[in-house]
Amino acid sequence: MSFSRSAADPADTLPDLAATLAAPGDDAFVALGDAFHTRLPAAPLPAPYVVGFSAEVAQLLGLPPSLAAHAQFAELFAGNPTRDWPAHALPYASVYSGHQFGVWAGQLGDGRALTIGELPGSDGRRYELQLKGGGRTPYSRMGDGRAVLRSSIREYLCSEAMHHLGIPTTRALTVIGSDQPVVREEIETSAVVTRVSESFVRFGHFEHFFSNDRPDLLRRLADHVIERFYPACREADDPYLALLEAAMLRTADMVAQWQAVGFCHGVMNTDNMSILGVTIDYGPFGFVDAFDANHICNHSDTSGRYAYRMQPRIAHWNCYCLAQALLPLIGLQHGIGDDDARAERAVDDAQAVLAKFPERFGPALERAMRAKLGLELEREHDAELANQLLETMHASHADFTLTFRRLAQLSKHDASRDAPVRDLFIDRAAFDAWANLYRARLSEETRDDAARAAAMNRVNPKYVLRNHLAEVAIRRAKDKDFSEVERLAQILRRPFDEQPEHEPYAALPPDWAGSLEVSCSS
C-alpha cells in the first residue's frame, strides 16, 4: 500500500499515512523478528496540540506541509489511535543493552520510544518514524514512558539545527504537547517528539545479543544493517569486520564535526550511539558558550566523563564496545582452525581496525579547523596554530561561536580591525600574540581578506542553539505561546547567514544563562 503524495486535501492524506506507516518493507528492522522488539499501542496523550512542525522534514517524507492542519494530526503523532490497528501493525519498542557512564548496565531498550513505521523519502531513502514519549514499554524499568515539553522542544530544535550545520543527525518532524502532568525534578507537562531516521539501531543493539550469547540473532542484525545501510561491506573479505570499520569511521567523522562547532552531547553511552554514525538522543546536550575544554553540559555527569575534550576518546571507547560485540562474527567465513584460533584472529583484526580511529579523527578535525581559520593551503603547523587559539580561548573563556565567527573580520595587514574578536578575550595580550602568528600564516595564503571571510562564514555559524535561547522558547511554550519555537527553528535553519534582523540571537548569553543546568531528567 503506498502513500499518495499528491493528495490535495489533508483530510484524505492522514488515513493513507497511517496505512503506509503500518506496512513496512520486508527489509525493515521490525521484520527481524520478535526477539528484537515488542509491539504495543502507545499510551493515549489527552488533548494533544501541535507545538512545533517542520515542513522541511515533512517534504523529505513526501508529506504535504498542510498536514499539520489536519484535525487528527496531533492525535496521530501523540500516539493516540486514529484507526483500528491490527496486532501485526502496532508500534514497537526495540530491546538493546549498553554501557552507561562506562559501566555495563545490562538490558535497556526503548523505554519511552515507539516506532510507528517507515515512509519513503523524497531522496530515495526510507525513514523510520519514532514517537519519543509514547508511553511505557517492557523496557521502561522505573520510568513512566513519557517525555516532557522542555526536553521535547530541545530535541526538536537541536535535531534540525544540527542538520543545517551539516552534522549527521536524526531529524524531527513535530512536537506534540499535552497538559498531562508528569513528575521529574518538578511537575512538568508531557510531550511527544517524532524522531526521523533511516535507522535507530544503536551500538547497544549489538551488545544486547552478544551479552545474551545469541550469535544467530547478532548475525541477523548485522546482516540487516549491512544489507540496508552498508552494502559495500558485502563485498569485503570479512563483511562484519568491514561493518565495524565503516561504523567507526562515520563515528569519528561525526565527533570531529561536533568538536568543530563546540557541541557537547552530554551522555555518550553506548546505547546512545547510532550504528549509522549520526547524532542521536538529544538529552542534556549543549553548545559551548565561554570556551572551556573541560566543559560538562550534563550536570548529572559528576565525573566529567562526557566533557567536551573527552568526546573523541569516549567515541573511540564506544567503538571498542561495538567491536567486542561483533567478535563472534568476525572471521566466521574464513573458518580458521578451531574456535580459539578464530577468536584470537578476530581480536587481532578488530584491534587493527580500532587503531584507525585516531588516524581518521585527527585529520578530519584538522581539516575542519583549517577551514574555520580560513586556511586554504595545508601547512605542517596548522594544527598547532588552531590548538594555540583554543588554549588562548580557554584561558580567557572567550565565546566559542563568536570567536570563530568574528575571526573572519580580522585583516591580514590591519590590526585595527581586530577589536570585535579581540574584545572577547580577557587576556588581550595573549590574543595579540596569537593574532600575530595567525597573520604570518595568512601571508602564505593567496585569497584576499574578503574571499577568506566569505569562506569562513560558510563554516563558522553565527547562530547555534544556545541553552538560554532554548529556555526562552520553552518558557513561552509552557504558556501556550509557540511562536518562539517557530522563530528559533527558522533562524537555526540558516545558521551561516547574517540575518541582521535576528542579531540578538547571536549575542553573548545574558548573565542569567549561567545558572541554567541540563541533566538526564527528561
From Swiss-Prot:
Top enzyme category: transferase
Residues involved in ATP binding: 109, 111-112, 132, 144-145, 195, 202, 281
Domain of life, source organism: Bacteria
Gene Ontology MF annotations: AMPylase activity; ATP binding; magnesium ion binding
Keyword Manganese: yes
Cofactor(s) recorded in Swiss-Prot or TrEMBL: Mg(2+); Mn(2+)
UniProt-listed Enzyme Commission number(s): 2.7.7.-, 2.7.7.108
Pfam family membership, one: SelO
Catalytic activity, reaction form: L-seryl-[protein] + ATP = 3-O-(5'-adenylyl)-L-seryl-[protein] + diphosphate; L-threonyl-[protein] + ATP = 3-O-(5'-adenylyl)-L-threonyl-[protein] + diphosphate; L-tyrosyl-[protein] + ATP = O-(5'-adenylyl)-L-tyrosyl-[protein] + diphosphate; L-histidyl-[protein] + UTP = N(tele)-(5'-uridylyl)-L-histidyl-[protein] + diphosphate
Keyword Iron-sulfur: no
Active site (record annotation): 271 (proton acceptor)
Keywords: ATP-binding, Magnesium, Manganese, Metal-binding, Nucleotide-binding, Nucleotidyltransferase, Transferase
Binding site for Mg(2+): 272, 281
Function recorded in the entry: Nucleotidyltransferase involved in the post-translational modification of proteins. It can catalyze the addition of adenosine monophosphate (AMP) or uridine monophosphate (UMP) to a protein, resulting in modifications known as AMPylation and UMPylation.
Family membership noted in the UniProt record: Belongs to the SELO family.
Protein name: Protein nucleotidyltransferase YdiU
Organism in which the protein naturally occurs: Burkholderia vietnamiensis (strain G4 / LMG 22486)
